[in-house]
């Protein structure tokens, strides 16, 4: 590892790492969430993730995305300021690294994603792209089929989940673990859907797919408590 990293925890074979600036409490919280999400994963998916060298990097409050050595190359992207855009990125087979941020892990008031758990979202991408897809070549076809059906049904209109199959999956995982944000009317990012129970009613096909990989737990280590003020229309 790059000498930037000074702290380390082992989440069932997934290293959780950070610089000296990352408080121990944030590293431990990331470890808890990763361990929690992996509990129900099939053994072959876990083995694929561990064997690929997937890891989770925690950014300190005053570190940016490009302070992470593996993401420093994003400084040269003139189309986007990644230090403003992202407080967490998912991993894939080209770069098996998930990142997240201290302020979201510990629910600081200044967290710009205060209503949702970003590590759950970003680690969901890694589970998909590092753990499942490489050993299940037909998985994306399954997702594409589910995605096409919800489009035909007019669901997820004006939400981030409708970006592509990757965000459809990751937003679904957030809903599964009851750590997504909700709004009364779709705002381009979210809608009224933010819990597993609502997901089962609103999108039972995605719910059934997720149930093959995740446990239907009721309590989460996330500090982002479930707030369910709105319910999505079922049709």
Where are these regions (language model features)?
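Short, conserved helix/loop micro-motifs enriched in His/Cys and acidic residues
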Residues: 101-106, 146-155, 188-190
